[in-house]
């Protein structure tokens, strides 16, 4: 409750001014579950302009949605006016938002009962939709009619399965049936929003359970490039996903599991940044090389430690090995390399030009590469004079 106490002065101040105010959302849910608390959000009957008038230190980030960031005790908190939402457009956003003075009206528009619990500053729960019961049963249940909730915002179906992965809960029967019925509506949702949820699914503690739900509800068939992947997705549930430390590894392993032959094309379809695509593809390519042979100095040097560590964890998952020392071994091998990158070489193109008395040309870059590999393999010491002598001995000058 420590973090809530830091923010409780906001609620107390709002109440002193005649308004209602409560802690709401994921932070309350995680407090009940005893999980680490993320952002703490506050809902209030005060209108945005009233919130801004009460708290001089504020940032008006989303006034059209009723949200003001209030800075209290050096921490930012989202304070949002109670609201209801009208008819939804395109199965993803309300056509308009109405501010209301009723907590119940605000909570009933939320997605799942576990996320529709409010809490007073004293820690008393206001649970109008049996959210605590759902948490106790470890069930994901929609607020009200599941069909209505998913037709309002189809992304809620992905969120539901993402919560399976992060919390280990199960989809309540009617909620699961509604996902099977309305899964096609996910095709109206921007792929960027789906990608965010899917990445949280892949990196969750209970990823395997969530992937099974993705198959059982047939929701996977409405995702880009996954329409024909039922058997491969089931294959992915047979592996241990616990060893990954980054989302890059999780995506690389997922692409391996589904047998994706054109990973860059797949990832572009899912709207990844070029940098992320490059890293994921690099991990996959390195894993392929790793399957053919163990690490050697040249492979490790060319790969770099960042990609090598991730590739080793993916490789270990692929071969279903639980040798937690393998990444440590890669780190030790890398630290023993004579140089870690080309910038550490004690020779330059100018040195070669001076020694050879030849005109500049492609031969300089080729020679630098030969020297680089020789240093990495331990064939020559990384000292200027030693390199010159080695070149002469090899008749390369």
From Swiss-Prot:
Q: What EC number is given for this enzyme?
A: 2.7.7.72
| Listed cofactors | Mg(2+)
Catalytic class of the enzyme: transferase
Could you tell me which InterPro entries the record lists for this protein?
A: Bact_CCA-adding_enz_type3_sf (IPR050264), CCA-adding_enz_C (IPR032810), CCA-adding_enz_firmicutes (IPR023068), NT_sf (IPR043519), PolA_pol_head_dom (IPR002646), PolyA_RNA-bd (IPR032828)
Query: Which catalytic reaction applies to this protein?
Result: a tRNA precursor + 2 CTP + ATP = a tRNA with a 3' CCA end + 3 diphosphate; a tRNA with a 3' CCA end + 2 CTP + ATP = a tRNA with a 3' CCACCA end + 3 diphosphate
Q: Which family does it belong to?
A: Belongs to the tRNA nucleotidyltransferase/poly(A) polymerase family. Bacterial CCA-adding enzyme type 3 subfamily.
Query: Its function?
Result: Catalyzes the addition and repair of the essential 3'-terminal CCA sequence in tRNAs without using a nucleic acid template. Adds these three nucleotides in the order of C, C, and A to the tRNA nucleotide-73, using CTP and ATP as substrates and producing inorganic pyrophosphate. tRNA 3'-terminal CCA addition is required both for tRNA processing and repair. Also involved in tRNA surveillance by mediating tandem CCA addition to generate a CCACCA at the 3' terminus of unstable tRNAs. While stable tRNAs receive only 3'-terminal CCA, unstable tRNAs are marked with CCACCA and rapidly degraded.
Task: Please state what the protein is called.
Answer: CCA-adding enzyme
UniProt lists the gene as cca
